[in-house]
Structures are given as structure tokens and as C-alpha cells.
Amino acid sequence: ELKEVSMKYNENGIGLILDVVYNHMSNTSTFNMLVPGYYFRTENYGQITTNFSGAGSDVATEREMMKNFICQNLTTLTEEYKFAGYRFDLMGLIAKDTMQAALESVQEIDPDTVLYGEAWTMDDNWDGNWKGHELAVQWNLNKMGSKANNGFQGVVGAFNDGFRTSVKVFTGKTFIPSITEASEAFSEGTNIFFMPFW
């Protein structure tokens, strides 16, 4: 059914963006049964899986077999379902090299495929690295690109972490649940659009 929907939208000139979550999952998943400990980031000599996402065990996207899985999964979705692009949940936890490989994989099939995501850091002390591996945080994205689009440098897009943080600081809220509350939060007189975002 999803394939049919995607095809119909494509026939009418509308591309679907699929939300994907590769950064975390339960450590009781099939991956951990295949190769215990390999697919997850750990601390304390492999005894504790990390949970920087706050949503489950962090996936070791820097490991070759996980990178391969992500690229194969995106390739299948792009070839079979014809998705126009992908929005990556907590992309800042995904290895930069894995995002680069993902970009190349999908743009080899369709150079117009869009990749973007949440490239923010998990806290103020996060330096965008995990044990020597650069992650796909906002300031590392300019190091990636694809030559697939007739020599055009394809890029991975990101939601602006600085803007997001400024909104949270300015409004005093970590989450604004409605348009009404957003307009109230921004009607205090200070213009958030003149605040530094980077």
C-alpha cells in the first residue's frame, strides 16, 4: 500500500519524504542477537549501552556492517518505493561517514534525492565526535557532499540547532505545542530573529 501511495504521488509530481530512525533502538533487537555488542555504542568496557538519544540504546552507525545496513535499506526504499528523500531522526548521533555513504547511495539512483535531519548535539558538552568518529552534527555537514547531480555538490541538510536552542532559551519552553502558544511566546517584544543562531 505504501508503495502504491508513493507511486501515485510521484505520478502527480509530488515526492514523499520518509522519516527514518537509525540512531537508536532496543538493545534486545535482532541486531544484538546476530553479533552481541557490535551494533551498539557502549561504555564501561562494553557493559553499558549509551543512550544519548534518550530514546533507547545508541546504534554504532560508525561500524561497517551497520553503515552497510543503512545504505542498503535506503537503496531499497529509493529503488522500490521511489521516495524523494529522507528525514533523519537525531542525525547528530549518526557517523558523518555513514551519512556520506548514505547520500552517495541514494543519489546514485536518483541525484535529486534529498537527505536532511536533526543535526544537533545532545548537550552543550558534546563535541560532535564518538571515540574518534566525526558525527553528522551541524558543523560537520559542510565536510560532506556528492558529485551525483551533474557535478553539483549535493549536500545533507539540517534543521538549525542554533535557532532551536535560541527559541527554547527565548521562550523558556523546551516545547511549544501549538501555533497559538508560539504566537504568544514571540509577542513579548523581543525579536528572536536578530539573535545569533550559530
What does each model-identified segment do?
Residues 85-91:
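Short catalytic-loop micro-motif centered on adjacent basic/acidic residues
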Residues 91-97, 122:
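Acidic-and-aromatic substrate-binding clefts and catalytic sites of carbohydrate-active enzymes
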Residues 103-198:
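Conserved alpha/beta catalytic core and glycan-binding cleft of carbohydrate-active enzymes
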Residues 1-81, 101-110, 114, 119, ...:
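Substrate-binding/active-site clefts of carbohydrate-active enzymes
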